[in-house]
Every structure is written in structure tokens, then in C-alpha cells.
Amino acid sequence: MLDFLNRMFSRDGGNSKNIAKERLRLVLVHDRSSVSPEIVEALKEDLIKVISSYMEIDERSLEVNLNNDEASVALVANIPVLGLKRRNV
């Protein structure tokens, strides 16, 4: 959660265009569902932790969205996979 706030309000996390784009995306996600932007960001961070234990992923290109229609809400994640990690079973 602190990482989210640092990225939203710091000037070194990326250029202004990318920061504005991320803020707008979070606002749109919130408007389209009853889930707060903070919950969506926490979900994104949890997904990164879990998936990273199995695969190498491009965290900067990862996208998580909530899409809804009249009947349901869908979690849509675009997670670029760079490679698989070997695990000892």
C-alpha cells in the first residue's frame, strides 16, 4: 500500500505522463465497480507476489482491471511472462 502511495505522489517513480495515466486508470476502475482503487492496487501487489514465485514477470507492464457489464464484474489481468522459475518439488 505504501508503494502505491509513493508511486502516486512521488516525482521519481516515472514521468508525469505515466503517473497521470496510472491515476486515471485507477479512477476509471473505481468508477466502473464498487471496489476502491486502493483495493485494486493491493490486489495487483498480491498477484505480483504470488505469480513471481512461479514465473519471472514484467511488473512494469502488468495491468489489472475490473470490467463489468449489467450482470457481473470480471477481473482482467494482463501479465507479461518473461520466463519460468525452476522449483524443487
From Swiss-Prot:
One protein family per Pfam: MinE
Residues passing through the membrane, by range: none
UniProt KW keywords: Cell cycle, Cell division
Superkingdom, natural source: Bacteria
GO biological process: cell division; regulation of division septum assembly
HAMAP family: MinE (MF_00262)
UniProt family annotation: Belongs to the MinE family.
Functional note: Prevents the cell division inhibition by proteins MinC and MinD at internal division sites while permitting inhibition at polar sites. This ensures cell division at the proper site by restricting the formation of a division septum at the midpoint of the long axis of the cell.
Protein name, UniProt field: Cell division topological specificity factor
Species the sequence originates in: Heliobacterium modesticaldum (strain ATCC 51547 / Ice1)
